[in-house]
Structures are given as structure tokens and as C-alpha cells.
Regions:
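Domain-scale activation on soluble regions of proteins
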Residues: 1-345
């Protein structure tokens, strides 16, 4: 990160997510290679879901693992440590839970040590996939920590775990996912389009979800009702449960300010289209469905067009969020003035 605080605090989350997702794909590829019965593979995937420890356990029951005793022992410890923190594969995708922050608030995640350990785990998966040693991402070091979370005693070049009492936790994720997707799309020319298309599209899909969910947390008079907030805030359904519940607040404040609301209908159609393609937020995460059928077989994808399409949806959500921040400030000022007026009388 060259000690860039934005990258250290914000890019760290999407980067770690992509490595974790790469490990999940690698272990699932191993399972597909070790088992010929389609229904058995499907059942393992359904039972284990995103749990890397369980998936690796299922893989080792089906084959002789090509690892040394040290590599095997280290890997099992690392996966167990990872799953204690991120069993659902959402730790790096959404704002940190209050319980986690209660334990780790104001601490620093050691980016280098955590990255080296996850790279080593990925390298072990590559060895199981029988990728030649010279082409693997990392070589094994028995002295490397098998702890998933590793902490530093300073913030220089590390990730600061901090959230203000009034914050909703979305800012660093939105910025991190947005800039990471832009970096992959615009600057990583050494990576082929085929290799980076799914990471970019998933980053953008998650970014749009974050943009919609962030509006749920706005404490404004005509915001999302509390019962809807409690029941829908963790949904992955972009159109049905996220957009449809933030549209009324967008429309209300746009009308109140005399703005043209026709763009709201345009964005709604775009979100509907994206939801038809990726209803549950997994179409860009996995190459196949649970029935093991390829989702994008022999399809020529215009990455630039899709990137701009998805970025436009997020830009609209981001603009709405800025407006709602201004509304929240104005409403807060009005409440204070009214309170002072009542006190005067």
C-alpha cells in the first residue's frame, strides 16, 4: 500500500475477500476433481456452504492429500482460525459486527502478516491442485503464523479497526470496493480480461448492495421504517428487498426539493435487470450453479459496458447518500433550534 492509509484501511477488505473467495473456489475445484458423482458434490456444497474448514475436511475424506505433515497441520489450524472469524464469508463484505468491534476496537490488523498467511494457505491449495511449484503463489514457511487475525502495535501501513459511535461502518467498505474495482479495471493491464472479469463484477455487485444498504441506516424523518430496517437490512435481494424499500425515501426527498424524478425510474429498471441476472449475489462468485452447470458458457462479455452500467447504478446510490447526509444535518439543526425555542419559553 506504500503506507497509504486509504488503501491500508479500506482496500484491505475487498483484497482479503478476494483471496478468501479464491481459496473457496480452489477447495471446491479439488472436491470436483476428487468426486465423480454429481449429487454427492452438490450435497457437500449445500452442507458446507462457505465453510473452508468443512470443505477441506470433505476433500481429504475423498483422496490422498499431497501435503507434508507440517503443511497439513498448518493448513488445518489456519482454516479453523479463519472460520472462527469468517464462517459465512461476509466478514470483509459488510460492516463489522458490534460484537467484533467490542473486542477489537482501536486495534491494528497487521496487513503484511495476514497477507502472507493467506497467501501461504492459497499456495497449499495450489499444491493440492498439482500446480508446479515455480507457478505457485507462495512457498511454505513452517514458522509463519496459522492465526487468521494477526495484530500490529502501530497503524503505520496497517488496518485500523475503528468506528465512531455515530458511524454506520459503510464508508470504508464503499470506498474500498469502489476503488479496488476501478483499479482492477483501469490499471491492471497485465491481468487478462478473462482472469479479472469476475472479480471486478463481484466487487461492483457488492458495492451496489452496500450503496443500497447504507441508505437503510439514515436517521431521517422519512427514512426506512424500523420494522423494515430490522427485517431486510441483511438481505442480498437488490430489487425486491433493498431498492423497493429505499425508493420511497429517495422519491419523497427528490419531490420535496423539486428535482426531476424520472431518473429514479431509469435506475429502477437497471436494478431490475441486474437482479434478473444475479438475484442472490452469487452469479459472479462461482462459475457454476449448485447443479454444476456453467453460468457463462461461450458468452462474449463486454466488460467495459457492464462496468459502466454497474458503476452508474452505484453513482446514483452514492449521490442519494450524500443528499441524505445533508438532510440529516438539516433536520438535526432544526430539532436543536426547536428545542432551544421551547427552552426559552
Amino acid at each position: 500500500t506504500n503506507h497509504d492509509n486509504i488503501k491500508s484501511d479500506m482496500w484491505f477488505f475487498p483484497t482479503m475477500y478476494l483471496f478468501r473467495q479464491g481459496m473457496e473456489l480452489g477447495i471446491k475445484a479439488l472436491i470436483c476433481g476428487a468426486i465423480s458423482e454429481k449429487r454427492k458434490i452438490q450435497q457437500i456444497f449445500l452442507d458446507c456452504k462457505h465453510d473452508l474448514y468443512m470443505l477441506f475436511d470433505a476433500y481429504e475424506r475423498e483422496t490422498v492429500i499431497l501435503l507434508t505433515e507440517e503443511e497439513y497441520g498448518w493448513m488445518k489450524k489456519y482454516l479453523h482460525s479463519l472460520e472462527e472469524v469468517d464462517a459465512k464469508s461476509d466478514f470483509f463484505r459488510f460492516p463489522l459486527e458490534d460484537e467484533f468491534l467490542l473486542n477489537y476496537q482501536n486495534k491494528f490488523l497487521d496487513i503484511v502478516d495476514m497477507a502472507n498467511s493467506i497467501l501461504q494457505a492459497y499456495g497449499i491449495i495450489q499444491k493440492c491442485l498439482e500446480i508446479p511449484e515455480e507457478n505457485r503463489i507462495d512457498r511454505f514457511d513452517a514458522m509463519r503464523s496459522s492465526d487468521f487475525l494477526q495484530f500490529a502495535n502501530h497503524g503505520f501501513g496497517n488496518c485500523y479497526l475503528w468506528e465512531s459511535i455515530t458511524g454506520d461502518g459503510f464508508h470504508k467498505l464503499v470506498l474500498g470496493y469502489s476503488q479496488s474495482a476501478e483499479f482492477l479495471f483501469c490499471e491492471c493491464d497485465e491481468i487478462s480480461k478473462e482472469e479479472k472479469v469476475f472479480p471486478i463484477l463481484f466487487l461492483l455487485r457488492n458495492l451496489i448492495e452496500l450503496g443500497l444498504k447504507r441508505m437503510f441506516y439514515k436517521t431521517i424523518e422519512h427514512g426506512v421504517p424500523q420494522n423494515v430496517f430490522r427485517s431486510k437490512r441483511k438481505s442480498h435481494l437488490l430489487y425486491k428487498e433493498l431498492w423497493k424499500n429505499v425508493r420511497p425515501m429517495i422519491e419523497y426527498y427528490a419531490n420535496a426539493q423539486g428535482q426531476d424524478i424520472s431518473i429514479i425510474n431509469i435506475v429502477e429498471k437497471q436494478i431490475q435487470e441486474l437482479s434478473c441476472i444475479d438475484k442472490n449475489g452469487d452469479i459472479f462468485r462461482y462459475p457454476t450453479s449448485y447443479s454444476l452447470e456453467y453460468r457463462f458458457d461461450n458468452i462474449d462479455l463486454d466488460l467495459k459496458n457492464v462496468y459502466e452500467f454497474m458503476q452508474a447504478i452505484f453513482n446514483f446510490c452514492d449521490g442519494c447518500d450524500c443528499e441524505f447526509e445533508s438532510v440529516a444535518d438539516w433536520e438535526s439543526d432544526m430539532m436543536q433550534e426547536m428545542a432551544q425555542y421551547q427552552d426559552w419559553y
